[in-house]
């Protein structure tokens, strides 16, 4: 979506690099996540872009399979990348998300 690309490029907090601190935080988070997933019983909606180059789709499948939640739903969006809420079919993604949330309110 062109306006998102424009906004992203102008965001003063956007960076094209990963800091060492961010890398450590991600590694720590992944380690915690792997131990905590078995106790995850909250409602969960897993959304993922099929062509995501940052996070493996397999990670979403693995979390979904390991989570203890009985109220869970997964949607892999074909052709989308990492930022599914900023892609060409973002209206569909947002609509699906809101529908899921409203059913639980």
Where are each of the predicted segments found?
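Alpha/beta-hydrolase
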Residues: 1-42
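Acidic catalytic loop of the alpha/beta-hydrolase fold
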Residues: 15-17, 23, 51-55, 83
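Conserved strand-to-helix beginnings and helix N-cap segments that scaffold or border functional pockets
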Residues: 20, 56-60, 86-91
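Short beta-strand/loop motif that positions the catalytic acidic residue
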Residues: 40, 46-48, 52
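Short helix-capping segments at alpha-helix termini
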Residues: 67-70
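Catalytic active-site module of serine/aspartate enzymes centered on a nucleophile-bearing elbow/loop
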Residues: 73-105
